[in-house]
């Protein structure tokens, strides 16, 4: 018999704001988080994007992390996960499972150092590193897994979390995804010529492409 699966906590960070309640309120007001690029160091500012309205330094300070090198994917993920754990009231427990979806992980850090590589290596660049860093912040996970299947990464993480609970392998699973905008994203989709210079209009006769965004949930 399959175990029953219920959701006990949610955390959301997006271009609409920080927190599930803030995001819901913004959606109900009909707001859009798509606007001119502010934080991504790109020359292609003609393409509007959905950026989380905080710089990397502001995110670090909000999480009370010491000075250091942190990928934006890591920071967004921690912020969303903290809200979910606080809602579910399992923050003081141990032995939890974390399954996080991401496409490029800490690519923003890779791009920062690419012009002048550093002699000392950092385990921050592969997509699974951000999952481990998110887990390390809370020190309550003994099982981590990364799903990296492009746009379906976080959805596959949710599916895997559900299966782990239904099978009885895990009692509590935290599942979702985190992704930060990078030059890799913007340049890649620009090369495909599918980015819109205005807010996208997917069901309109004048549709001209998509807008990229970032966030965690």
Predicted feature residues:
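Short conserved active-site loop signatures built around small residues
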Residues: 154
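Conserved residues at the C-terminal ends of beta-strands
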Residues: 176
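Short catalytic-loop micro-motif centered on adjacent basic/acidic residues
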Residues: 144-148
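Internal active-site segments that recognize and position negatively charged phosphoryl groups
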Residues: 160
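Catalytic metal-binding/acid-base residues of hydrolase active sites
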Residues: 179
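Short, high-confidence coil segments that cap the C-terminus of an alpha-helix
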Residues: 170-171
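Conserved "HGTGT" condensation-loop signature of ketosynthase/thiolase-family condensing enzymes
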Residues: 1-143, 163, 182, 191-211, ...
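Glycine-rich, Trp-frequent "lid" loop and neighboring beta-strands that shape
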Residues: 151
